Amino acid sequence: MKNFNLLAVSSILLVDLFPTHCGHNVDFSRGINLNGVSFNNVDASSHGAEQVRQSASRGRGLGENPKDEGADKPKKKDEKQVEPKKPRENKLKQPREDGAAAAGGGGNDGAAAAGGGGNDGAAAAGGGGNDGAAAAGGGGNDGAAAAGGGGNDGAAAAGGGGNDGAAAAGGGGNDGAAAAGGGGNDGAAAAGGGGNDGAAAAGGGGNDGAAAAGGGGNGGAAAAGGGGNDGAAAAGGGGNDGAAAAGGGNGGAAAGGGGNGGAAAGGGNGGAAAGGGNNARAGDQQPPAGGNKKAGEAGGNAGAGQAQNNEAANVPNAKLVKEYLDKIRSTLGVEWSPCTVTCGKGVRMRRKVSAANKKPEELDANDLETEVCTMDKCAGIFNVVSNSLRLVILLVLALFN
C-alpha cells in the first residue's frame, strides 16, 4: 500500500513538473476563445448564397431543358439588337434654366462651349455672353435669340433682335429661346450679336448701354465680334466686369474667348477653362478648369488631439523616486541602479554626469536621471520556485520510503 501511495504521489509531482509536455496547467481560456472564434465568426451569408446556387441548379435540372435554352438565345439576341440604345447623359451638367441653348452657341447658367466664355453662365464659340451664355460672334442677354435675329420677351423680328420689344438686324434678343449659331443669356443665344435690356443697333446689340458694330455689349459697351458685360469692350471681343480680350472676355481677359470672374485661355468662370467658360453660379466646372481649393481639401490637417503623448506614462512617481533615493543614496553612481521592484513596474535611477562628483547627501532630484522599469518575468520566477519545491518533496518521499 505504501508503495502504491508513493507511486501515485511521485507520478502527480512528475506530471506537474512538466506541464507543457503532459497537458497540465493548460490555459483553458485560450481554448475557449479559439472555440468561440471557430463557431461564432462564421459568415452565414455564404451559406445562403450556396443554397440559392443549389436550388437554381436543381430547378434547372428538373424543370428545364437546356436545348430549349439554346433555342431561346438567338431570340434574345435579336431583341437586344432591336432595343434602342439609351443616349448617355452627362450627370455633371446642371439642367438648363429659363430657356434652351442652341447648337453652335452657349447654354445658360451652366453650359460652356468651345471658343468663348460666358458670364455667370455658359460660353459659346466666338464671343462672350452676359450673365448667362455667349453666342458665336456676339452675346445675347436675359432671353432668347433666333438665327439672324432674336425677339425680346417673346417676339422676334426677322433679320434682327429687339430688347424688351424691338429687334435689330444682325442682333440678338433677350428673354426667350436660343437658335443655332449663337448663345443667349439666362437661356438663349443669338447668331451674329446679342442685345440686352436696352437698344439694339444694326449689326449688334447693346446691353444696358451702348452697342458697337459686329457685336453686343452688356451693361456697358460691346465690340465687334463679341459681347461685353458690365464693362468696356475692345475691338474684336467683349469684356465683362472690366477688361476684354480678342474674341470676347467676361470678368477677365482670354485670348479667343471670354472669361468670367477670372482669366482663361478660351474663357473661364470663377477660374480658368481652356476652350470654354464655366458657370460659377451653376457650379458646372469641368477640367481643364481652374477651381478654388476648398479649405482643408488640398492637404490633410492634423486635428487637435490626434497626437498622443506617450511620455506621460513613462514619468516616474516623484514620491517613489524620493523614497528610493533615500535607500540607495550612498551607493548610487552613474550606472543604472536595480529596479525598485522584482515584479511589475518600478523605477530605476542614476547620477547625471554633471553630478558624478557630488557627495551622496547633496544629491537631489535634479542630479538624477530616472526612468520606469518593467519586470515581465514574474510568472517564470514563481514557476521555478514551485517546481523546485515539488522536486524536493519527490526526493524526500523517494529516499525515506
UniProtKB/Swiss-Prot annotation:
Bias (Basic and acidic residues) ranges: 65-99
Domain named TSP type-1 is located at: 327-379
Segment forming the signal sequence: 1-22
Protein name per its UniProtKB record: Circumsporozoite protein
| Ranges for region Region I | 91-95
User: Residue ranges of region Required for the binding to heparan sulfate proteoglycans (HSPGs) on the surface of host hepatocytes?
Assistant: 80-88
- This chain is glycosylated at 342
Recorded source organism is Plasmodium cynomolgi (strain Gombak)
Segments of this protein annotated with the region 17 X 11 AA tandem repeats of [DG]-G-A-A-A-A-G-G-G-G-N: 98-278
Q: Which UniProt keywords apply?
A: Cell membrane, Cytoplasm, Disulfide bond, Glycoprotein, GPI-anchor, Lipoprotein, Malaria, Membrane, Repeat, Signal, Sporozoite
Q: Where is this region: Disordered?
A: 45-107, 132-240, 268-311
Family to which the UniProt record says this protein belongs: Belongs to the plasmodium circumsporozoite protein family.
Q: Can you quote the domain comment?
A: The N-terminus is involved in the initial binding to heparan sulfate proteoglycans (HSPGs) on the surface of host hepatocytes. The N-terminus masks the TSP type-1 (TSR) domain which maintains the sporozoites in a migratory state, enabling them to complete their journey to the salivary gland in the mosquito vector and then to the host liver. The unmasking the TSP type-1 (TSR) domain when the sporozoite interacts with the host hepatocyte also protects sporozoites from host antibodies. TSP type-1 (TSR) domain is required for sporozoite development and invasion. CSP has two conformational states, an adhesive conformation in which the TSP type-1 (TSR) domain is exposed and a nonadhesive conformation in which the TSR is masked by the N-terminus. TSR-exposed conformation occurs during sporozoite development in the oocyst in the mosquito vector and during host hepatocyte invasion. TSR-masked conformation occurs during sporozoite migration through the hemolymph to salivary glands in the mosquito vector and in the host dermis.
